Amino acid sequence: MKPKIRTPFFETSVKNYIYGDAVLEFAMAADRAAVKHDVDVLFISPYTEIRRIRENCPHLIILAPYMDTLRPGRGMADVLPEAVKAAGADGVVINHCERPMTLSAIKQTIARANELDMLSFCCADTIEEAQAIAQLHPDILNPEPTELIGSGSASDMGYVREAIRAVKAIDPNILVEQAAGITTAQQIYDFIMAGSEAAGSASGVLRSPDPFALLDEMVSCVRRAKDELALRR
């Protein structure tokens, strides 16, 4: 079975800012924050660290940054879905702006993820692209404008609400996240209060003066938003 994600949740990754032991240390900080604030944290791990993070961070939902759609056999240098799953990944990122894919490839990758009970976490550059991908029914959709990723400038609330409405109109079961350009814990809180089921940050955390402290603060804001939304119901 695929992992059951509790909303709202937090998502982060290391991209290529750090590597080796530093990745594990960051993942362990995310794992501690997940436990401390009782929030689900999705962690996009480099391939080389998936198994180590799985063995040391039992509370994280681990995503591979990409996978191919081939099956066991020939295909040297391709990323085999079964191998990613065996290493400990719970899901896979699909169509990130730094690894863009055709709609056909997105469809095939979602199908392979479903076959292996892996979560499909899709990215989209525009609301129109998000609508097209929503037709393929991924588990999670992150409509983040490419120009904002790593820029330090987040999407405005009008875009956030419009993106959520557009995706939910096609498939209300898709979880919608906002993550591009987030640099503060307050932005995490604001996006979730605006209706996003998740928010995340990678560059904003890792380029901050104290990444571990900011990571914990961001996860705490997910918890705060969750508690406040519960009181409104």
Predicted feature residues:
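Conserved N-terminal beta1-alpha1 strand-loop-helix module at the mouth
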Residues: M1-V79, S120, E128-H137, D216
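Conserved, mostly hydrophobic/aromatic
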Residues: K15, P46, V84, E144, ...
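Glycine/small-residue-rich loop that forms an oxyanion/phosphate-binding "nest" at active or ligand-binding sites
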Residues: P58-A113
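Glycine-rich beta-to-alpha transition loops that act as phosphate-gripper elements at the mouths
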Residues: P65-T69, G73-M76, S104, C122-I127, ...
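Glycine/Thr-rich beta-alpha phosphate-binding loop at enzyme active sites
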Residues: L70-R71, A77, P138-R165, I174, ...
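Catalytic cores of alpha/beta
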Residues: V79, A124-H137, G181-A199
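Glycine-rich phosphate-binding active-site loops on the catalytic face of alpha/beta enzymes
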Residues: D90-M101, L141-S153, A194-L215
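C-terminal helical cap(s) of enzyme catalytic domains, especially alpha/beta-barrels
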Residues: T109-E115, S155-G158, G204-R233
